[in-house]
Amino acid sequence: MFAIDEVASGCRFVVTDRHGGVSTAPFDTLNLGGHVGDDADAVRRNRGLVAEALGVEADHLIFADQVHGDQVVHVDGPWTGRPPSCDAIVTTRADLALAVLVADCVPVLLAAPDEGVIGVAHAGRAGMAAGIAMRLVDAMRDLGARTILGRVGPSVCARCYPVGELLREQVAELWPVTRSVSWHGEPSLDVSAGVLEQLWPHCFDVEQLPGCTVERDDLFSYRRDRRTGRFAGAVRLVEQERA
């Protein structure tokens, strides 16, 4: 169920894999995306399994309606009605787990356990270029976060993400660190490098979690498979162990 499961200083970072759910091919088995053509009941059950493993109620595992933008929304409880269209969410609620859906884009997971603030962002090429990770940090600071821990989850690597020369240069003009080349020598982008560039000046501890979605068959990848599911990166606050 979890490709990565880390408890660190009062927070828990997880990245799901594609195993342990109930969806059938090509969404087998732990698809968490409700917009990909999978059976809605299977998605609901899969999300319930992840929520249970995280120790929260099913409706307390919070997803947004991701739109490849740069908007951040403050969450104060389970959604009533349709989730808002945004690509980052923040909360101070310890009974909520925040999650983002990905299948090549970068899941950004942030926590400030000492101040009781968490946030997540879905950083695709467009969102990264627009500074979604920095906007998430700013929103967390507005809620009192000071010492921020960050985890940047698995995504498509630069070697597997060829783009046109013009697009690469447009993005690299904003974030030079993203300029790269593919396995075949084509122009490419390193989106996760751009995310890390945005986070490093503002976070106490940032780590890139290993794995390329195209190269790892235990993770969903739209670029590799097209018709496929979505995995999630999630974070929640947990009680810190007392010495």
Q: For each of these PLM feature ranges, what is it?
A:
Residues 1-243:
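Active-site microenvironment for binding and transforming phosphate-containing groups
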